[in-house]
Each structure stands twice: as C-alpha cells, then as structure tokens.
C-alpha cells in the first residue's frame, strides 16, 4: 500500500510541475509578461510565484474571460498543490484527495488551454 501511495504522490507531483511549466510559458506570452521562476525552484518559491500571478492577473489588459482563465489556472494549481501537500501529514482520505488533486490539475490545464487559444487569436 505504501508503494502505491508513493507512486500516486509522485505522479501527482509530476503533473503539478508539468502544469506549472505550462503556466509559466503562457504567462510569458501575456500582453504584460509575468515572469515565473523555473520549475526547479523550491516549492515555496513556486507557490509564492503562482499566488502573486493570481494577485496581479487583474492588471492584465485582457478580456474578462481570459483573465478568469488565468486566475482559475492559478487557483486550481494552488488547490492541487495544497492537496498534494497533505500527503506528508498522513491525514487520511487519500482517494478523494487524489481525485480532487487530479481534477484541480485538469481544471488548471483546461483554463490554460483556453488562455493559450485566446493568445493565439491575438497574434
């Protein structure tokens, strides 16, 4: 069972870092680029960067829908990060937390896809 938990945790962490990389790329393409640190930084540094990105999303000169996609991708990423972080504390409820983290990452990915599509249309 412990091996399964370790694998699921590792898979979720890998997905979290992949979505972070996508968020970082999209943020560089915004009308007012947002520079997020590379994905090799400390977890706290990444959390603070995504939180800051969420805070300044409203300052982007983009339509409401695109802004909502940016904010949603940040919030979903932060939510997944919180859920994945609970593994360290062995608080139980693994199955629903696994699924919630997966869905949060899926939501972030979908929002980033929408935002990337809007950015392509502007080119």
Predicted regions and their residues:
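Alpha-helical segments in soluble extracytoplasmic regions
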Residues: 3-60, 97-120
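Long, amphipathic, charge-rich alpha-helical segments that form helical bundles/coiled-coils
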Residues: 62-98
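Intrinsic disorder/low-complexity signature
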Residues: 1-3, 66
């Amino acid at each position: 069972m412990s091996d399964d938990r370790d694998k699921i945790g590792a898979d979720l962490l890998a997905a979290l870092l992949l979505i972070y990389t996508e968020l970082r790329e999209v943020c560089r393409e915004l009308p007012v680029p947002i520079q997020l640190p590379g994905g090799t930084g400390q977890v706290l540094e990444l959390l603070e960067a995504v939180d800051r990105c969420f805070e300044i999303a409203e300052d982007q000169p983009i339509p409401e829908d695109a802004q909502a996609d940016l904010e949603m991708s940040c919030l979903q990423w932060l939510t997944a990060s919180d859920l994945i972080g609970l593994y360290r504390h062995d608080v139980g409820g693994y199955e629903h937390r696994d699924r919630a983290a997966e869905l949060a990452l899926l939501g972030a990915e979908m929002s980033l896809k929408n935002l990337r599509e809007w950015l392509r249309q502007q080119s």
